């Protein structure tokens, strides 16, 4: 789609149309000129990161012609980042997929054939055959799905019902496993409930901010702008930034800290020791609200059991812990002295002490922010727990301006992956498949026979790759992600399983990504406002939007695909006789009828949708399926501190932060006066735990799974850049963003480059024990690694940096460590 300057000028002048829709257009747009009623404006959350910025979408003749920041959004207040301003263009890439494509040869499916257009009916025919064969031959463990933190709430919920309730397989996991799983397990271990207790309002309340492994300036730029305003307009405010290399967030740092990879664990134990030694502990808070426990150590690295590191581990994968006293904890952290921390981390003592003083000062309200630097870590859960330790020791938690806060990278990693429970071990509202009571709640809510949901945890993301390679997972559906590019160790652990003739791989995507082109069947998928949706952002804010434009060609939403596919399976084909006998009324019914068209999900008629806002899925299925799915899903959490507002409310507001009780959202959880679930007089109650107390864990430093040695002499860290989002499958199709950062480069310290005879712009081969990739040397620019470390973004499909990375994971969260592996460099001679 080509939009002229005149088109954009007209769109931005559409004040009258926006006003008619109850929207506010920024003053700058009001000054553009003449208005037009031909453009319709409506609200939506942004499609990119987990900040949850509000956007106004302008549509005309079935196309998006403009977008701008929503000034009525409390998140971004009319501001978007550079990606947000180009949202319309992600929809209209020249290679947008509009038909199902199957690998075929001589008119038949062939694993080595060419992609050939087919109908949806034929696409589902081959999918049905492959899934039924896998179920018949090997059972529910032979089928699986890899979903997304970009799924809408009801897409994730429908997938959860189909996989765990329909196919009876817990082999459902989201790509959020690669980014937020350590945060999830960390919150659950310490507080018994997932997600931050604070909100973005903390930014305007805090006196200090500490960024742990978070480049907010590029990855969460709108929140960074709010923090920048707070820092520059209040002289007393301080910012500390910790990372293994310098990046743009360092430009505002009062205390810029570059540390040796993995030693963030040492630094946090030092800070805990400093707090105790300087009598900065909030003793009353600890006595009333905190327990102490010693965690298991030497827990391995989440590699295959045959790997030498796993064989050597004393307690591989152990989440065990035992009670301890405050005095025991004091003794434990005492060994993490300032001198030891400085020596191990490479950080000057004065910088470490300055950082510790921020946490220790009772007059300083402090927020800790982190993203992938903490979570993509072989001890990511520990890192999360250790950060909570600092806030619990000082009582700086669950109060305006103070608290630990994990920032999410996807628009609904919280709302869908975490809250809906699309992980292999989870169910909605923090319930888990290993808990019999939780399974019973789900089975009752879904009207399923007792015993339908398996109690064994399914395959997580990396385990799915291994099972595909081993031939034990044979029918596999990937939706709304590009894991062939984004996941670790492509050469050894992913590509072999995808191309194994025993396996059938389906990818649903709007574009021909690396993942799509590696699959056997590609299903064209609707994007963003081509469907009605809901996302949940990092501050627990649930936001809705209406379908605003049609999908191109034959593209269908993930929701439609999941629900329509359910029609292909009768209960007798997927459930054993003993389950069917419990529900004889289900005999002859298919999973669509049992899970979706069941008078619970299907009880909301089309008449509840405004005439001009009917969405494609509701029209196709004949009922307001989004409302039915949402209300059923919301029933899991209501009354249990996961309360969501009624469905219709969300279409009228700019999101609400749960728990929502009596129409009021909750800004700070666990604190009396803010949280309706804290009884009067208790002040603070961490009610996720049976005794209402959070846990401080004693956890040590343990080394990375792979470190530089004489041959592979450099650390490699991977990540993102401002202009591109994840694998670039959307942003690289925006000409302006592509031109701004057209290809990946290898950021390296100038002296490391010089020592290897490399110059800026040279081609260089980056080699690990698992693979190699050719990139370009960059010794200047926004990212400035220290000596001994190189940094490379993963957005470039022509430079698959995950050919290099190790599939080591945190043994507790199963999240991959993309920040630490060992590489060497070779100059490429032209």
Curated annotation (Swiss-Prot):
<feature type="binding site">
    <location>
        <position position="558"/>
    </location>
    <ligand>
        <name>Mo-bis(molybdopterin guanine dinucleotide)</name>
    </ligand>
</feature>
<feature type="binding site">
    <location>
        <position position="531"/>
    </location>
    <ligand>
        <name>Mo-bis(molybdopterin guanine dinucleotide)</name>
    </ligand>
</feature>
<dbReference type="GO" id="GO:0016020">
    <property type="term" value="C:membrane"/>
</dbReference>
<keyword id="KW-0732">Signal</keyword>
<dbReference type="GO" id="GO:0009055">
    <property type="term" value="F:electron transfer activity"/>
</dbReference>
<keyword id="KW-0500">Molybdenum</keyword>
<feature type="binding site">
    <location>
        <begin position="718"/>
        <end position="727"/>
    </location>
    <ligand>
        <name>Mo-bis(molybdopterin guanine dinucleotide)</name>
    </ligand>
</feature>
<dbReference type="Pfam" id="PF01568">
    <property type="entry name" value="Molydop_binding"/>
</dbReference>
<feature type="binding site">
    <location>
        <position position="175"/>
    </location>
    <ligand>
        <name>Mo-bis(molybdopterin guanine dinucleotide)</name>
    </ligand>
</feature>
<feature type="binding site">
    <location>
        <position position="179"/>
    </location>
    <ligand>
        <name>Mo-bis(molybdopterin guanine dinucleotide)</name>
    </ligand>
</feature>
<comment type="subunit">
    <text>Component of the periplasmic nitrate reductase NapAB complex composed of NapA and NapB.</text>
</comment>
<comment type="similarity">
    <text>Belongs to the prokaryotic molybdopterin-containing oxidoreductase family. NasA/NapA/NarB subfamily.</text>
</comment>
<dbReference type="GO" id="GO:0006777">
    <property type="term" value="P:Mo-molybdopterin cofactor biosynthetic process"/>
</dbReference>
<dbReference type="InterPro" id="IPR027467">
    <property type="entry name" value="MopterinOxRdtase_cofactor_BS"/>
</dbReference>
<comment type="function">
    <text>Catalytic subunit of the periplasmic nitrate reductase complex NapAB. Receives electrons from NapB and catalyzes the reduction of nitrate to nitrite.</text>
</comment>
<dbReference type="GO" id="GO:0051539">
    <property type="term" value="F:4 iron, 4 sulfur cluster binding"/>
</dbReference>
<dbReference type="GO" id="GO:0042128">
    <property type="term" value="P:nitrate assimilation"/>
</dbReference>
<dbReference type="Pfam" id="PF04879">
    <property type="entry name" value="Molybdop_Fe4S4"/>
</dbReference>
<dbReference type="InterPro" id="IPR009010">
    <property type="entry name" value="Asp_de-COase-like_dom_sf"/>
</dbReference>
<feature type="binding site">
    <location>
        <position position="49"/>
    </location>
    <ligand>
        <name>[4Fe-4S] cluster</name>
    </ligand>
</feature>
<dbReference type="InterPro" id="IPR006656">
    <property type="entry name" value="Mopterin_OxRdtase"/>
</dbReference>
<keyword id="KW-0813">Transport</keyword>
<dbReference type="GO" id="GO:0008940">
    <property type="term" value="F:nitrate reductase activity"/>
</dbReference>
<feature type="binding site">
    <location>
        <position position="83"/>
    </location>
    <ligand>
        <name>Mo-bis(molybdopterin guanine dinucleotide)</name>
    </ligand>
</feature>
<dbReference type="Pfam" id="PF10518">
    <property type="entry name" value="TAT_signal"/>
</dbReference>
<dbReference type="GO" id="GO:0009325">
    <property type="term" value="C:nitrate reductase complex"/>
</dbReference>
<keyword id="KW-0408">Iron</keyword>
<feature type="signal peptide" description="Tat-type signal">
    <location>
        <begin position="1"/>
        <end position="31"/>
    </location>
</feature>
<dbReference type="InterPro" id="IPR006963">
    <property type="entry name" value="Mopterin_OxRdtase_4Fe-4S_dom"/>
</dbReference>
<keyword id="KW-0479">Metal-binding</keyword>
<keyword id="KW-0574">Periplasm</keyword>
<feature type="domain" description="4Fe-4S Mo/W bis-MGD-type">
    <location>
        <begin position="39"/>
        <end position="95"/>
    </location>
</feature>
<keyword id="KW-0411">Iron-sulfur</keyword>
<dbReference type="InterPro" id="IPR041957">
    <property type="entry name" value="CT_Nitrate-R-NapA-like"/>
</dbReference>
<feature type="binding site">
    <location>
        <begin position="212"/>
        <end position="219"/>
    </location>
    <ligand>
        <name>Mo-bis(molybdopterin guanine dinucleotide)</name>
    </ligand>
</feature>
<feature type="binding site">
    <location>
        <position position="150"/>
    </location>
    <ligand>
        <name>Mo-bis(molybdopterin guanine dinucleotide)</name>
    </ligand>
</feature>
<dbReference type="InterPro" id="IPR010051">
    <property type="entry name" value="Periplasm_NO3_reductase_lsu"/>
</dbReference>
<keyword id="KW-0534">Nitrate assimilation</keyword>
<feature type="binding site">
    <location>
        <begin position="262"/>
        <end position="264"/>
    </location>
    <ligand>
        <name>Mo-bis(molybdopterin guanine dinucleotide)</name>
    </ligand>
</feature>
<keyword id="KW-0004">4Fe-4S</keyword>
<feature type="binding site">
    <location>
        <position position="372"/>
    </location>
    <ligand>
        <name>Mo-bis(molybdopterin guanine dinucleotide)</name>
    </ligand>
</feature>
<feature type="binding site">
    <location>
        <position position="794"/>
    </location>
    <ligand>
        <name>substrate</name>
    </ligand>
</feature>
